[in-house]
């Protein structure tokens, strides 16, 4: 057990253009080496491209993509005796959103050759249509949790 106090939740201010805090969370994950302006440019170009390709509101596509990729359960390693079990646990909403963003960006970074905003656009559109690498990752996690359901009583 940690002897420190629990960390206070930080309030995420919405982004300046779309006034959306989810978009700001994604920008913070896209950002590398403190280059937030570049992260904003990637995200806004991606939003423009989504609007062109789908003829829908890009914020709706973004929220639907995040909702589709957000996991409900995950597995965590737990040592009991000498063996390690993969124990399925429910995911809190904040952690689920963070995992979804992380998986979408990991899927984008895995592909090489195209600019980041195009990769992000394609991945978000795929995720909103329930396909793509991030959805596969979510399904894999859910399958692993289903396989280890027997260890659910080994809670933390």
From Swiss-Prot:
Keywords: Plastid, Ribonucleoprotein, Ribosomal protein, RNA-binding, rRNA-binding. GO terms for cellular component: plastid; small ribosomal subunit. One of its GO terms (biological process) is translation. It comes from the Eukaryota. The keyword Cell inner membrane does not apply. It holds the Pfam family Ribosomal_S7. Belongs to the universal ribosomal protein uS7 family. This is Small ribosomal subunit protein uS7c. It comes from Prototheca wickerhamii. The lineage of its organism: Eukaryota, Viridiplantae, Chlorophyta, core chlorophytes, Trebouxiophyceae.
């Amino acid at each position: 057990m940690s002897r420190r106090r629990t960390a206070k939740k930080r309030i995420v201010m919405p982004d300046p253009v779309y006034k959306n805090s989810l978009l700001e969370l994604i920008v913070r994950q896209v950002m590398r080496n403190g280059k937030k302006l570049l992260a904003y440019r990637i995200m806004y170009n991606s939003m423009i491209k989504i609007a062109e390709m789908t003829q829908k509101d890009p914020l709706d596509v973004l929220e639907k993509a995040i909702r589709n990729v957000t996991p409900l359960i995950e597995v965590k390693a737990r040592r009991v005796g000498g063996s390690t079990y993969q124990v399925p646990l429910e995911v809190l909403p904040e952690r689920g959103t963070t995992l979804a963003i992380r998986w979408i960006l990991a899927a984008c970074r895995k592909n090489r050759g195209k600019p980041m905003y195009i990769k992000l656009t394609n991945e978000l559109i795929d995720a909103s249509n329930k396909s793509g690498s991030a959805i596969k990752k979510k399904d894999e996690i859910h399958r692993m949790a289903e396989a280890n359901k027997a260890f659910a009583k080994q809670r933390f």
